[in-house]
Amino acid sequence: MSENRLPDYLDHIQQAATDARSFVERMAKDDFLADKRTQQAVIMSLIVIGEAATKVMDGYVEFTQAHADVPWRSMRNMRNRMAHGYFDINLDVVWETVQEWLPALLQQLPAVRQDADDEDRNDNCERGISDDC
């Protein structure tokens, strides 16, 4: 049986979203649009978010269905646009994503992560490999 990586993937999403938000903290949109280094850092964070979301979608289908309010598909699609359409990245969309979409995601993640921990604990109990039952 393979190791449950779901909590790790959710942690990657949480960390990358937190990083992206911190990169633009106290920054005006015009400053972001003029700062290539910050743009690159934010874009990389969005790619990490999308990569982890793809792993969750591919490996934990029932979990994503149970958490359909989380924008898994949007995270994956954003990653694909960033990774494969680099010369066509719309920085206005990147800014909007970090300012509006990521705060909402960061509010959702603690409960989603708790559900993943509960599910992992229940699986371990069923397999008899945990004393925390």
Where do the model's predicted regions map?
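Solvent-exposed interaction patches of small proteins and small membrane subunits
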Residues: 1-133
